[in-house]
Amino acid sequence: MSNKKIIFFTGGGTGGHVFPGISIIQKLKEFDNEIEFFWIGKKNSIEEKLIKEQDNIKFISIPCGKLRRYFSFKNFTDFFKVILGIIKSFYVLKKYKPQLIYATGGFVSTPAIIASSLLKIKSITHEMDLDPGLATKINSKFANNIHISFKESEKYFKNYKNIIYTGSPIRREFLNPDPKIIKQLTQNTNKPIISILGGSLGANALNNLALCIKKDAEIYFIHQSGKNLNDLSEKNYLRRQFFNAEEMASIVKFSNLIISRAGAGAIKEFANAGACAILIPFKKGSRGDQIKNAKLLTNQNACIYIDEDEILNINILKIIKKTLKDREKINSLKENIKKFNNKHSSTLIAKLLIKDIKETKSK
């Protein structure tokens, strides 16, 4: 075992599988600046882009194939990509000899977790959503520990002993958002601010919704569209493909109302901010994870839920304006969503990993 302290992270596909890992690394650096960090992911991916924006995290790409629950001819070619990913991960981990590997989700994480098991390197997989995805289900068979973001997720891991409720880490920029930023973005508007957030990859349904309602003169709209639309600034409308972490933190905290998908990472950021949110979970082509996330919050009166198929059949503006006028409802939604926040998540996980490193190096 190397004398160096090394931790590998792996995960990707969306920002929701990357931002929690970045948060953990930020906290680990506060506790121990001697730890070296690596991130295994897919080439030319969202995880490569986000990790290369960070300081002192080395990115290593591997071949990877998507894990599917349904028949597709791509399953045959992707199977071999997974095998190649395991082989490359094996040699990478053997070369650097990390004490730990931490998976934050997504199919790209599975080859590295399997390789770590072959090399007897301690591994941990973190499920961000309420119910585990296929990648986490596979990872959990090889990992030493499982971290979960929702307490309610324990029922999906009844046959596993090493389950730890950690919550989902959020980026440090979200801990103390600056109100001046949203004022600058909205040209110091006095209008209520509605933010339509499509996530790191954008969301066509939310983009179309934004284009339909943005002309309402009584509201200022902030729209994060992803790369499919160009940046645009109008009198009561600001559209960006992406906002940086400081901007997004201010938007989430100080918007009057947020319209968003229901990814676990976004929900945890809304919970931290005590945001009033309308959630429209991704439905078509998904495994239903966002729907379960949104329904969990709805059952505890922590969000307004709208089915994606109903977007064109209902008057969203009417719902928005009715909600804005109902101060009691807004306060209730804000307080209830806070119950899903574990503000010490990054610290808890960082301390667990440091403990694991010490135990590994002492052997």
UniProtKB/Swiss-Prot annotation:
It catalyses: di-trans,octa-cis-undecaprenyl diphospho-N-acetyl-alpha-D-muramoyl-L-alanyl-D-glutamyl-meso-2,6-diaminopimeloyl-D-alanyl-D-alanine + UDP-N-acetyl-alpha-D-glucosamine = di-trans,octa-cis-undecaprenyl diphospho-[N-acetyl-alpha-D-glucosaminyl-(1->4)]-N-acetyl-alpha-D-muramoyl-L-alanyl-D-glutamyl-meso-2,6-diaminopimeloyl-D-alanyl-D-alanine + UDP + H(+). Disulfide bonds: none annotated. It is found in: Cell inner membrane. GO terms for biological process: carbohydrate metabolic process; cell division; cell wall organization; lipid glycosylation; peptidoglycan biosynthetic process; regulation of cell shape. It is a peripheral membrane protein. Pathway: Cell wall biogenesis; peptidoglycan biosynthesis. Keywords: Cell cycle, Cell division, Cell inner membrane, Cell membrane, Cell shape, Cell wall biogenesis/degradation, Glycosyltransferase, Membrane, Peptidoglycan synthesis, Transferase. UDP-N-acetyl-alpha-D-glucosamine binds at T14, G15, G16, R171, S200, Q290. GO terms for cellular component: plasma membrane. Belongs to the glycosyltransferase 28 family. MurG subfamily. PANTHER family: UDP-N-ACETYLGLUCOSAMINE--N-ACETYLMURAMYL-(PENTAPEPTIDE) PYROPHOSPHORYL-UNDECAPRENOL N-ACETYLGLUCOSAMINE TRANSFERASE (PTHR21015:SF27), UDP-N-ACETYLGLUCOSAMINE--N-ACETYLMURAMYL-(PENTAPEPTIDE) PYROPHOSPHORYL-UNDECAPRENOL N-ACETYLGLUCOSAMINE TRANSFERASE 1 (PTHR21015). This is UDP-N-acetylglucosamine--N-acetylmuramyl-(pentapeptide) pyrophosphoryl-undecaprenol N-acetylglucosamine transferase. It comes from Borreliella burgdorferi (strain ATCC 35210 / DSM 4680 / CIP 102532 / B31). The gene is murG.
